[in-house]
Amino acid sequence: VYAPRTKGKHALIICPNGHFGQGRYRKDQQQRMATLARMGAVCVDYDLYGWGESALQVGGKAHHTADAHTIQAMNGIWILDYMLANRKDIDPACIGVNGGSGGGTQTVLLTVLDDRFTAAAPVVSLASHFDGGCPCESGKPIQLAGGGTCNAELAALFAPRPMLVVSDGGDWTATVPRLEYPYLQRIYCFYGATDKVSNVQLPQERHDFGPN
């Protein structure tokens, strides 16, 4: 948990980690959390189930199972429950979720499962043609339910609440500016809220969630 030194109520950001080396102990990950805290938000950073620190408890093989898809989603909801129940410095009207790669997939899934989130920022993850390359992202084939859907459609369920989608030119999110983002804009338009969804495209970058 990273928290501001200032008193009063603060926004809360739930931050599911992605498939990056060293998990939540990675230097740039800690720098990002500390920066968000200095900006005034309480942040909770946690590893995916069976990944990083979690692998020390349940083993790395547990991560590559369909059950991981469910368990890590529940972990995000339970963390939110815990923070709201036990922290007096949280503003329940300002709850964000932000993760990269597999953490970005979790970001979208959490917005679908829990309407307490008021802002979301999936990073290097959102695509209409790729559900995630790990069973922890697609082990429970939710994209095949009800005749079929995709992560872009799941993200659109968050409208009209604010969403920032970060994409790059070196992975499957390269299509976001011409495919997924216009679709999201169209859905947000139905709510008169096109100003609430935005995309930052970094064409020279690759698949990471580093200090840049």
Predicted regions: what they are:
Residues 2, 46, 98-100, 105, ...:
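Generic beta-strand/beta-sheet core signal
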Residues 20-31, 63-74, 97-108, 141-154, ...:
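Alpha-helix capping and helix-loop boundary segments enriched in small/acidic/polar residues
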Residues 1-9:
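Short beta-strand-to-loop junctions in surface cap/lid or active-site-entrance loops
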Residues 119, 131-184:
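The feature captures the conserved acid-bearing segment of alpha/beta-hydrolase catalytic domains
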Residues 8-86, 92, 126-136, 140:
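Cap/lid segment of the alpha/beta-hydrolase catalytic domain
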Residues 81-147:
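Primarily recognizes the serine-hydrolase "nucleophile elbow" in alpha/beta-hydrolase
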Residues 8, 159, 166-212:
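Alpha/beta-hydrolase-fold serine-hydrolase catalytic core, especially in secreted/extracellular enzymes
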Residues 9-12, 39-42, 91-94, 115-119, ...:
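Loop/turn elements at helix/coil->beta-strand transitions in domains of secreted/extracellular proteins
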